[in-house]
């Protein structure tokens, strides 16, 4: 491809509304253009990259035995009402009526549509297992679209759905899809980690997220330095570093603590180690009008997913208001504790192992110090309530935990029968009786992968694409292309490279565009390999080669360029 025949839409300045680096570079490299909030047009340069992601995803899905379909992006309300999600789904579901007054939505996901298809097409266990996938536009009406393609309203997604007669069959396909996802991200040249994840409201027996590692990632992912254990922060089990509770060394005492409403103030005023403090958090119970106390150590953070999964706790988690606290306990949030607390109590595992600690006295401006379990109050219900921190023991007993930032680009679920049961998706089983199908769900954010790859691979000059993802593998930059010698050598090499199957962008812009601008544009776009053709080089029988990841260029004999690139470029 020649730049004279291409839409080369690079920009020198960074748009003011672009915050994250992927958004900035995709705009500057001429990959996308904003249409409206959360809506983007893919320009030729960007679309070439996305099509490469799609191709690899498609190849791995086909290799895993999945069959491609294409479902409508517009979905009738009746299916969502049947599954119960029409009422459950929030304002992210864009709803509208057609000219006949019938309700529809713009599909953010396709569980209902695929389940309807399966119940109409499948009748016998002999047709199972079946795994169907599509690559389709999705729409979620995000309240605050931001970060370009990282959190837009319209996006491209690969979603697959599998159907099974039993859990054992689902597990086989789930494992196969897990491997297929690992294959996809490996082939894309990305540093990634699959991590255990919480199923949340979807339910089911298993769930994994796939994260591209990047400092700009929105998610914390946890992994062991001594094993393959990995999970997201919501799912990771917090194992206490302590193995036993020290014996009491202090007497229980009631202390006046005026103007001490926070853990930080308590630590500073009374020289109390933060590890000897607790946070008492009061939340709504499942039973209307009731409250439950959740207690974690002062230096730990409550994991709201774990907390909401506790028996009796309302989900999603709702914190009690100050009025509710005063009505139920008689004190404000900064003075609460488990001693004489008239509520059910759940404490974190690390709290159970504390001794001689400080707590609120359930009286404003008063705390108890020197508190000890069993001596001063009974040990209540114990559960895993907190987020892990770096250095915690790995739950599998091998090594300690490290935490990195990641961008979620894929998620696989074992759905169980959540949708098939609600929508009566059944087949006749081997015994001739109806069987409700088990389902799996497997998603990859195709357009999000493009942005995540840039977040992981960039420098001060622009994007750094892998050979697999780059819009073009080679930038061919002639200096003084208008001269006969340079033009003939450039055109000859261009023909040889394209005939060899390479994707080449020949920068044939005229002499008004300086070499510096040409080089800067190619680096901004992120083309992995650059060949420069010049009078001086040709006079010496050489061309100049530079890798996008290397600082220095090198001279190559003209006759060796093709073989050099064939050996170097991963295809």
Swiss-Prot record:
Its EC number is 6.1.1.15. It comes from the Bacteria. Keywords: Aminoacyl-tRNA synthetase, ATP-binding, Cytoplasm, Ligase, Nucleotide-binding, Protein biosynthesis. InterPro entries: aa-tRNA-synt_IIb (IPR002314), aa-tRNA-synth_II (IPR006195), aa-tRNA-synth_II/BPL/LPL (IPR045864), Anticodon-bd (IPR004154), Anticodon-bd_dom_sf (IPR036621), Pro-tRNA-ligase_IIa (IPR002316), Pro-tRNA-synth_IIa_bac-type (IPR004500), Pro-tRNA-Synthase_IIa_type1 (IPR023717). The keyword Aminoacyl-tRNA synthetase applies. It is found in: Cytoplasm. One of its GO terms (cellular component) is cytosol. Pfam families: HGTP_anticodon, tRNA-synt_2b, tRNA_edit. One of its GO terms (biological process) is prolyl-tRNA aminoacylation. Gene3D superfamilies: Anticodon-binding domain, Bira Bifunctional Protein, Domain 2, YbaK/aminoacyl-tRNA synthetase-associated domain. Catalyzes the attachment of proline to tRNA(Pro) in a two-step reaction: proline is first activated by ATP to form Pro-AMP and then transferred to the acceptor end of tRNA(Pro). As ProRS can inadvertently accommodate and process non-cognate amino acids such as alanine and cysteine, to avoid such errors it has two additional distinct editing activities against alanine. One activity is designated as 'pretransfer' editing and involves the tRNA(Pro)-independent hydrolysis of activated Ala-AMP. Consists of three domains: the N-terminal catalytic domain, the editing domain and the C-terminal anticodon-binding domain. Belongs to the class-II aminoacyl-tRNA synthetase family. ProS type 1 subfamily. This is Proline--tRNA ligase. It comes from Pseudomonas fluorescens (strain ATCC BAA-477 / NRRL B-23932 / Pf-5). The lineage of its organism: Bacteria, Pseudomonadati, Pseudomonadota, Gammaproteobacteria, Pseudomonadales.
